[in-house]
């Protein structure tokens, strides 16, 4: 069963006041725990977020690698030691950026957010990314090791700021985007509540690769 597409569509903005709001361009598929029949609960969130990134911007499963293919690629390119294949070892944004290049997906640009800083200092970068046609942004940390994807940003007055979070930790077979929205698997979250100030974070910001740009022109 193909994953659901663009599951954030229909969500209301998080703030009613004057805001600057930017969402990702293009389309994506929502990959989550067990969506292909493999029980990866407890270790697969980084792989699932990577798969969502690979499905952008067409929102199609073609070209999206399975978990075994990701592990094989990382081992073959020397990023992981022999025996990584078939393991339950996690991956993060650095591995995701390597795999995006390896599998011919969108371009991935890494950004490091030091411990204790939080994402407030990255709001302008994220806003410019989404407003400029960027795709989903993978986020992962150390104290907060739960990988997730960001699909948009909303900056209000003062310190009010929200990010649109897509959580890959869902287990089951969702019937509709509204089901996921109601349960909070995709939704707007206040930045200070969504991210642990005691964790560093890596971001992997996706944009069209040169090959994808050429296909768009064609």
From Swiss-Prot:
Pfam families, A to Z: Peptidase_C78
Query: At the top level of its lineage, which domain of life is listed?
Result: Eukaryota
The GO terms describing molecular function are: cysteine-type peptidase activity; deUFMylase activity
Q: What does the UniProt keyword field contain? A: Cytoplasm, Hydrolase, Protease, Thiol protease, Ubl conjugation pathway
State the InterPro entries in the record: UfSP1/2_DUB_cat
What's the Enzyme Commission number for this chain?
A: 3.4.22.-
One GO term of the cellular component aspect? Answer: cytosol
Keyword Oxidoreductase attached: no
**The keyword Hydrolase appears for this protein:** yes
Provide the protein's localization.
Cytoplasm, Cytosol
Q: Which residues form the active site?
A: 45, 167, 169
Q: List the disulfide bonds.
A: none
**BP terms from Gene Ontology:** protein maturation; protein ufmylation; proteolysis
- Family according to the record: Belongs to the peptidase C78 family.
Q: What does this protein do?
A: Thiol-dependent isopeptidase that specifically mediate the processing of UFM1 precursors as well as the deconjugation of UFM1 from target proteins. Mainly responsible for the maturation of the UFM1 precursor, a prerequisite for conjugation reactions.
The record's listing under PANTHER family reads: INACTIVE UFM1-SPECIFIC PROTEASE 1, UFM1-SPECIFIC PROTEASE 2
Q: What is the name of this protein?
A: Ufm1-specific protease 1
């Amino acid at each position: 069963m193909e994953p659901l597409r663009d599951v954030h569509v229909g969500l209301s903005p998080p703030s009613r006041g004057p805001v600057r709001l930017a969402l990702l361009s293009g389309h994506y598929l929502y990959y989550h725990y067990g969506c292909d029949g493999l029980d990866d609960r407890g270790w697969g969130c980084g792989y699932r977020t990577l798969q969502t990134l690979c499905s952008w911007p067409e929102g199609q499963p073609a070209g999206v690698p399975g978990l075994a293919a990701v592990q094989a690629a990382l081992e073959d390119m020397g990023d992981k030691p022999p025996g990584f294949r078939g393991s339950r070892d996690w991956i993060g944004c650095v591995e995701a950026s390597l795999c995006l290049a390896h599998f011919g997906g969108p371009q991935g640009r890494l950004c490091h957010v030091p411990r204790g800083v939080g994402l407030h200092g990255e709001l302008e970068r994220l806003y410019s990314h989404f407003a400029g046609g960027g795709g989903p942004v993978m986020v992962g940390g150390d104290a907060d090791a739960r990988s997730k994807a960001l699909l948009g940003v909303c900056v209000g007055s003062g310190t009010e700021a929200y990010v649109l979070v897509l959580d890959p930790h869902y287990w089951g077979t969702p019937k509709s985007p509204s089901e996921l929205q109601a349960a909070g698997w995709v939704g707007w979250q206040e930045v200070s509540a969504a991210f642990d100030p005691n964790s560093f974070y890596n971001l992997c910001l996706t944009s069209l690769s040169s090959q994808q740009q050429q296909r768009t022109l064609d």
